Amino acid sequence: MEQYYGEIAGIATAFCWTATSMFFEAAGKRIGSLSVNLIRLLMAFFLLGTVNWLYRGLFLPLDASVHNWLWLALSGLVGFTIGDLLLFQAFVVVGARVSMLIMALSPPMAAISGWIILGETLEYSAILGMVITLTGIMMVVLNRPVKTKNGKKTKLKDWFNNPLGLLLAFGGATGQAIGLVLSKKGMEGYDVVASTHIRVMAGFIGFVIVFFFMKRWHKVFIALKNKQAMKGVTIGAFFGPFLGVSFSLLAVQHTLTGIASTLMALVPVLIIPPAVIFFKEKINVMEIIGAVIAFVGVGLFFL
């Protein structure tokens, strides 16, 4: 079992991100996604600092080397600030379905980046597992119920006629892939929670700069007064940038980046049960088939 720590951590990351996506979606509808991003990172900063202080005696990762700080901070800026900004804007321009479909490119991009930056190479069985898993994920995304506009169904092909939206989604996928690879390069055996802390700090500073340029601070202050939204952000921050990102770094620390990224991409599949149970959504046969295919691909990583 020890040899699969990375793969297990990758799956744990996907479960955490499934939970956080539901809470952040609800909060984002109330206070906006940009405010959610800034506040969640601030909350994660204090959560991570508290954990670091309890078991390492340091609230801030002051024992990190210059190498750790440089690459992990860069990872936080690329992954959290740039990647998330582009992805959330893509949600607005072309919708969540097309954005998540483009985001399925993140694992192969992470594998390629891992090969270029870290010299990682995937075995044929791992490549096959990645292809099968991502095929299943894309089947699930493509077959999710389409939201209607003015009583008419929006065709998927119509959403692909927006090159700006596609570029934004592709930029988000690239940011997340490269951010993950940079985090692995930056850790080099350093503590996972402390590494996550550095990434979160860099991401938070990046968003602070963005808010200054966009002059959106008044919306943050309004958001902080929304008790219902703050509950969602708090729970989402716990499962997302606190637990989820920590698990993601644990994953890349113990397995290849491409494999870890593929397992983390299971969110569209894992969200099916809560969507049915809590939101009473209907699923179709193709979604079920896609989910089964995805898990068959995951199984190949454990052979």
Regions found by a protein language model. Name each.
Residues 62, 66, 103, 110, ...:
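Loop-to-transmembrane alpha-helix entry segments
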Residues 12, 39-40, 102-105, 124-128, ...:
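Hydrophobic core positions of alpha-helical segments in small-molecule transporters
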